Amino acid sequence: MRAARTFFRRIAAALLLAAFTGCMKWDYGPTEEFAAPDGGLFILNEGNFQYGNASLSYYHPATRQAENELFRRANGFKLGDVAQSMTIRSGVGWVVVNNSHVIFAIDLRTFRETGRITDLTSPRYIHFLSDEKAYVTQLWDNRIFIVNPKRYEITGCIECPRMTMESGSTEQMVQHGKYLFVSCWSYQNRILKIDTETDTVVDELVVGAQPASLVMDKYGKMWTVTDGGYE
């Protein structure tokens, strides 16, 4: 019975995703100029699912002041639907917008878009292996996408074993040497081990239901938090 409920939930979610894929329109408006001071904190506001009201804020501890809706104000259009995560690398912010199927690259001082990676299924997190190679985890997909951040394009994918498009879910990533570990979250219970030189899954670890957070401590030990799933 539980398997049947899970199946129908995933079918409904897949239909919703199909209905909204390609329907996101960017409504452009006026822009503002910014020059953010160093030492601030970026705050990603997820927003409500299917409302397209995700936003980006910047808080400066020295002045105790915050600026809100910075992406929209700097670029003239909204960030999108469900801002999932943000990664900073080499002075560039990479904002993963899950239900808009896009990753924006932004200047950290002006908040202006410098590029975007599109045609993603339902991106969750991005992990950089080099300036020209990164992995992107996904929901509702049995693949981890390989992207070239310099060219803002998808260059390949990693097939995850025993996952279908409907049951696919990869989440957070940590790296130890040449190996990358990926938690498999929604309705999953595994952590995958990927050889980053061959872009293949070489091993897996079964854990509790729905491992979400994943970190590596300074002693080389990996920690995960499982949320236990839901009925």
Q: Which residues make up each language-model segment?
A:
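Predominantly soluble domains enriched in secretory-pathway, periplasmic, or organellar proteins
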Residues: 23-231
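Sec-dependent bacterial lipoprotein signal peptides
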Residues: 1-22
